Amino acid sequence: MENLDEIRTDIVESTAPLLQESSSESNGGGEFNGASFSGAVFNLATTIIGAGIMALPATMKILGLIPGITIIVLMAFLTDASIEFLLRFSNIGNQRSYGGVMDDSFGKCGRIMLQVSILVSNIGVLIVYMIIIGDVLAGKNEYGIHHAGMLEGWFGISWWNRRTFVLLVTTLTVFAPLTCFKRIDSLRFTSAISVALAVVFLVITAGITIIKLFTDGLMMPRLLPNVTDLSSFWKLFTVVPVLVNAYICHYNVHSIQNELEDPSRIKPVVRSALAMCSSVYVMTSLFGYLLFGDGTLDDVLANFDTDLGIPFGSVLNDAVRFSYAAHLMLVFPVVFYPLRINIDGLIFPTAPPLTSSESDLRFGSITAGLIAVIFLGANFIPSIWDAFQFTGATAAVCIGFIFPAAVILKDRHNQATKRDKTIAICMIVLAVFSNAIAIYSDAYALFKKHTYVYPI
């Protein structure tokens, strides 16, 4: 039984063979000699930059620029430390997956806890992505008020730009093809485009900010938080979950490492991706807050529904919204990849790897089933977002901080230093505190929503 567990450990996440050796490309044709450094960086950066980027300018409004930017940078360093813990104990325990590390430290129970956390977190994230894409392209009804989508604004109301049809076409033409790749490296080009689209949003925001600065002038941004009473003090902590979850990418690190031409370069890959993402985060937060000031909404994308007061403002609004929707479409398959592997690990713990040719039927069935569940959840279960706000917050901090810290504190191989254990304790305290705030904030917002008096 122990041998069986060891075999399955290598399958839990990204079970591609060690790619220093040439292997046939699973997706048809050619030899695969390992992923490039740049492709690995783009895939990891795309895993990091998701929907949360739009909430960062609002954190600057609450914290002020100096503490806000400082915390964004500090969280990048803390994420690097948590990933380094996993990679180091992977090498020590001769494991090639996050699940393998958890299995090595906590046995089968630890591995299953990780798989369930990734299942809950990633299904929730992907459903939210699909909901956001539907909101941007097809519009939504909220509190009895209809918010027109981009397609409706361009072409008027028609059967083909209604929400369900738009998401069905997006699923069949974008999500289905991109989720059919067996190697994450096959997504390197779409990941590069995804990062470029995030930069497009940043460039447009920066450009508008500079134009407004020289034409109308901008208010002086708040450098430090404005704490006037106990309520404003507690409000500072509401941004903690956004910042803590900003860099969660741990479930794809081993998959990317296993496919690298030189797996020993995974640490530079991680640090390059974190440096790139933290730069995008800081610049987006800075320019977004400078542009909208105290009018910055919790989701800055909503600010681009208003008149910007500059020439071609409506065109720029549409460019921002479309680039964001397209960005999420290309993030989708990168987040879907570890979800499929971990679902397979839960349901078929002793089956051959999904990358093998004998697993084609299982691969296709799991892929189709997951896409169907995500599509149905985004379209036909209105309250599903509320549910995943609670479960997703808990699962994400477990994946990013609690599990890596627990591996260090368990220290099965007696390799952790006192400094490692101190950092691990700080991670757990931060994660638990962040999760408690997130659950309280979500519960309070949900209570307010259900007590809202809808207009007649």
From Swiss-Prot:
Domain of life of the native organism: Eukaryota
InterPro entries, alphabetized: AA_transpt_TM (IPR013057)
Keyword annotations: Amino-acid transport, Membrane, Transmembrane, Transmembrane helix, Transport
Transmembrane domains' residue ranges: 37-57, 58-78, 118-138, 164-184, 191-211, 236-256, 273-293, 328-348, 365-385, 388-408, 423-443
A single BP term in Gene Ontology: amino acid transport
Protein's cellular compartments: Membrane
Topological relation to the membrane, as annotated: Multi-pass membrane protein
Transport found in the keyword field: yes
Alphabetical list of Pfam families matching this protein: Aa_trans (PF01490)
Main subcellular location of this protein, as a coarse class: membrane
Gene Ontology, cellular component aspect: organelle membrane
Family to which this protein belongs: Belongs to the amino acid/polyamine transporter 2 family. Amino acid/auxin permease (AAAP) (TC 2.A.18.6) subfamily.
PANTHER family the record matches: AMINO ACID TRANSPORTER, AMINO ACID TRANSPORTER AVT6B
Name of the protein in its database record: Amino acid transporter AVT6B
Species of the source: Arabidopsis thaliana (Mouse-ear cress)
Gene this chain is encoded by: AVT6B
